[in-house]
Each structure stands twice: as structure tokens, then as C-alpha cells.
UniProtKB/Swiss-Prot annotation:
It holds the Pfam family Methyltransf_25. It comes from the Bacteria. Belongs to the methyltransferase superfamily. One of its GO terms (biological process) is methylation. The gene is ncmP. Its EC number is 2.1.1.351. Disruption phenotype: Mutant loses the capability to produce nocamycin I and nocamycin II. Mutant produces a new nocamycin intermediate, 21-demethyl-nocamycin I, which was designated as nocamycin E. It is an enzyme of class 2 (transferase). Keywords: Antibiotic biosynthesis, Methyltransferase, S-adenosyl-L-methionine, Transferase. SUPFAM superfamilies: S-adenosyl-L-methionine-dependent methyltransferases. This is Nocamycin O-methyltransferase. It catalyses: nocamycin E + S-adenosyl-L-methionine = nocamycin I + S-adenosyl-L-homocysteine. Involved in the biosynthesis of nocamycin I and nocamycin II. Catalyzes the methylation of nocamycin E to yield nocamycin I.
Length: 280
């Protein structure tokens, strides 16, 4: 699994991405002191650790991730920080194994919004929440297709264009399905799934996050340190250097002697579970 290989470099290349997204998400869901929070797809703790500060000693924060090396590394960091209210465990983010009504807040940053069968996933999260509980998800603003996906001058589509579709269809059918239209769902699909699961006050906010790197090569290298690596690994090894060089040229030309930057459009979707009795 790609994410098993990422634990050592995930969110650690010097390009700030997961942490600023996490801070903004927490501002939106606003977990209060004393609440119990579940973070789905916790990775290296971008949401987990600042959430622990917000809920304080009277609350708890539980992180789950499907990648065992990620879980081990994040659990070790929680122990090093002396965070006794934080626990990290292996778990399937699409179907977390907790009793109903275990949490006041569920967050899933750059994870659940990308799951297939979002309506079913949203319904499972609703079951985990107590009445009036809050949910907050983040994901990419859905592009029409992966080939059209661009983070400003950083064209993810250039990597996707170098993938041989027939080879992917034979060996990675789930990823092959992403090569069609709306790989991350149609616009509004996440918000619609939350409403169908019984959430109210559902809001979707799109914001651009600027990515900065010391060099074009460093920014291209960042794409190997997160989920974008999935697409790189589908490119034949002898083609990767040429694709990377193309991306470096694009970024350098865009910078025109200034800072090397890209722009990641992030979708934040939040909601509140309808209180007991069904009255919003």
C-alpha cells in the first residue's frame, strides 16, 4: 500500500499542506473543551494533535488510519508529546468500528471525502455521533477529470497523462475508475451525502491554499510524499524523469524569478447532526 511507504515523509518535506488545512478545518468545526473527537485517516497527526489541544484534558481524541506504519509513527509521537488523551489505532475509515454515539465530533481531512459510496460512509459517521454532534471533511475541490486537475502551475494531469490506461485497468481497477469523469465525485456530492445522512446546517467552503517550496524540484518532490504518489507509481519508471522535468519547467516559468508556488483548491464541508427529536 502506498501509504505504508509514506509514513516517514508524510507531511515532512517542508511544504506546508496538511497542517494548514487541518487548522482551518478545526476552526470551522470548533471542537470545545471536554468533547470526544474521532479523526478519520489521521496520517501523521495534522488534525489529531491540534485537536487534542482544543479539547483539553477533559476530552479525548482518537485517530484511525488504514496504514499500520502511519499508526505506529503517530502513536509514538503522541506518547513523546505526553498526550494521554490521544489514542491512535488501525482502522477502516470507511467503516470505523466504534459503538453508536461514541463521539461529539468526527473529522476526516483529505480522506473520507475521497471514499467511494459516500452516502453509506456519511451514514456510518452519523451513527457514531451523539445528538447535535459535528462533522468536518476536507478534500480537493473536485476537478472534472484527473487529466484536468491542476494545482495552479503544478499540473497533476501531466502525471496522469503519462499513465497507460490499459495497464492500470488490468492491475488497479479501482484506480482505473478514477481516470473517468469526476474522480472525486461530482460538485456538491459530499454535502449531499451529509444531508442524506441526517446532517443539518451543511456548508461547503472552497479556499485556495498556497504551496511554497524552496525550489521547483522540491515542490515536485512533495507530490511523492502524499497521496499523489499513487499516480506517480503508475507511470513507467523510465518515463518519470521526463514528466518531473516538465513539471519543473512549468513551475519555474510561472515563478518568473520569484518564489516557487502552487495553489491547491481545498473543499471544506461541515455539518451538524440533527438533535434528538428531529428538530434542527
Amino acid at each position: 500500500m502506498v501509504f505504508d511507504r509514506l509514513a516517514g515523509i508524510y507531511d515532512a518535506t517542508g511544504v506546508e499542506f496538511f497542517r494548514p488545512v487541518a487548522r482551518r478545518l478545526l476552526d470551522l468545526v470548533d471542537p470545545r473543551p471536554g468533547v470526544d473527537l474521532l479523526d478519520v485517516g489521521c496520517g501523521r497527526g495534522a488534525v489529531l494533535f491540534p485537536a487534542a489541544e482544543r479539547v483539553g484534558p477533559g476530552g479525548t481524541v482518537v485517530g484511525i488510519d488504514i496504514a499500520e506504519p502511519m499508526v505506529r509513527a503517530t502513536a509514538a509521537e503522541a506518547a513523546e508529546r505526553g498526550l494521554g488523551t490521544v489514542s491512535v489505532r488501525l482502522g477502516d475509515g470507511a467503516d470505523p468500528a466504534f459503538p453508536a454515539g461514541s463521539f461529539d465530533v468526527v473529522t476526516a481531512s483529505m480522506s473520507a471525502a475521497l471514499f467511494p459510496d459516500l452516502p453509506a460512509v456519511a451514514a456510518r459517521y452519523a451513527r457514531l455521533l451523539r445528538p447535535d454532534g459535528r462533522i468536518g471533511l476536507t478534500g480537493p475541490v473536485p476537478p472534472p477529470s484527473l487529466r484536468e486537475w491542476a494545482l495552479g502551475p503544478l499540473r497533476v494531469g501531466a502525471v496522469v497523462d503519462a499513465i497507460a490506461p490499459e495497464a492500470v485497468a488490468a492491475t488497479h481497477p479501482r484506480i482505473a475508475a478514477l481516470l473517468g469523469a469526476h474522480p472525486f465525485g461530482a460538485p456538491g456530492a459530499v454535502a449531499d451525502a451529509l444531508r442524506a445522512a441526517g446532517f443539518v446546517e451543511v456548508r461547503e467552503l472552497h479556499e485556495d491554499l498556497e504551496l511554497r517550496a524552496p525550489s521547483a524540484e522540491a515542490l515536485v518532490g512533495w507530490t511523492w510524499s502524499n497521496g499523489l504518489r499513487v499516480y506517480w507509481e503508475l507511470v513507467e519508471p523510465d518515463r518519470r524523469a521526463a514528466v518531473a522535468a516538465e513539471l519543473v519547467r512549468d513551475l519555474t516559468a510561472h515563478a518568473a524569478g520569484g518564489p516557487i508556488t502552487a495553489t491547491y483548491p481545498v473543499a471544506y464541508v461541515t455539518g451538524r447532526l440533527r438533535p434528538a427529536g428531529g428538530t434542527p
